[in-house]
């Protein structure tokens, strides 16, 4: 089974890209889709109604959504394989810029909106620097000069990343992405690891302390 993990900030076009991928492959292979979010998500319902594919969603609750993704991904792989899926697409919440949801196997795709600002790639850290592919969306809403600057900023963060631009609603210029998915090897579910290093550790705020100020906190976070 192949694995594709799609990350990116809210409203960047992750679900629109997912729909284009599903539309392209749904008649060739069996697809499963997992959405990880915090409060509410409707993408699973949309994809199931529109394309009739297997879908699930997970709410992270009190966990960071990307930490929750690490916890549930093993079960998701088992679920997809048990349903004879050929491709599992995981769409992250994209809310934790310090974390990277990508694994040592499969394809990691970062979706960036061209209208998010030219400094967005630099601010997103590991979500960009550890991705295999960057898809820049909403290119019809900016000038050619702005697009070139965005590409340059992404290259400064990750020199080897595979770049492509699209209007994800229409799905133009994505043939290379489809080829990369088609050519990607299947995963070995017993040897899946995070590609990057996780954050330093759990701080007192993570475990529920609400007091304001350094004097109330201790451990890995120090002044």
Protein language model regions, located:
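P-loop NTP-binding site
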Residues: 1-16, 21-25, 184, 188-223
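Nucleotide-state-sensitive switch-loop elements of NTP-binding domains
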Residues: 2-104, 139, 172
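Short, glycine/polar-rich helix-capping loops at beta-to-alpha or helix-loop-helix junctions
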Residues: 41-45, 119-124, 146-153
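Short, surface-exposed amphipathic charged segments that create phosphate/polyanion-binding patches used
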Residues: 69-74, 172-185, 204-209
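Inter-motif core of Ras-like GTPase G domains
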Residues: 94-116, 125-132
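Canonical P-loop GTPase G-domain recognition
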Residues: 133, 140-195
């Amino acid at each position: 089974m192949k694995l594709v993990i799609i990350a990116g900030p809210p409203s960047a076009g992750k679900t629109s890209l997912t729909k284009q991928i599903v539309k392209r492959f749904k008649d060739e292979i069996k697809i499963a889709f997992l959405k990880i979010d915090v409060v509410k998500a409707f993408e699973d319902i949309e994809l199931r109604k529109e394309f009739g594919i297997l879908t699930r969603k997970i709410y992270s609750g009190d966990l960071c959504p990307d930490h929750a993704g690490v916890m549930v991904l093993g079960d998701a792989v088992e679920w997809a394989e048990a349903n004879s899926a050929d491709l599992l697409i995981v769409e992250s919440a994209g809310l934790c810029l310090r974390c990277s949801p990508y694994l040592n196997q499969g394809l990691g795709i970062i979706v960036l909106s061209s209208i998010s600002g030219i400094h967005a790639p630099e601010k997103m850290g590991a979500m960009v620097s550890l991705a295999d592919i960057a898809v820049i969306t909403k290119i019809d809403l900016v000038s050619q000069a702005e697009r070139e600057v965005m590409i340059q900023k992404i290259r400064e963060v990750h020199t080897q990343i595979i770049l492509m631009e699209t209007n994800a609603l229409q799905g133009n210029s994505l043939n290379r992405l489809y080829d990369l998915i088609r050519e990607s090897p299947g995963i070995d579910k017993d040897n899946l690891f995070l590609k990057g290093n996780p954050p330093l550790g759990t701080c007192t705020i993570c475990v529920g302390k609400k007091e304001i100020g350094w004097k109330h906190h201790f451990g890995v976070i120090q002044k």
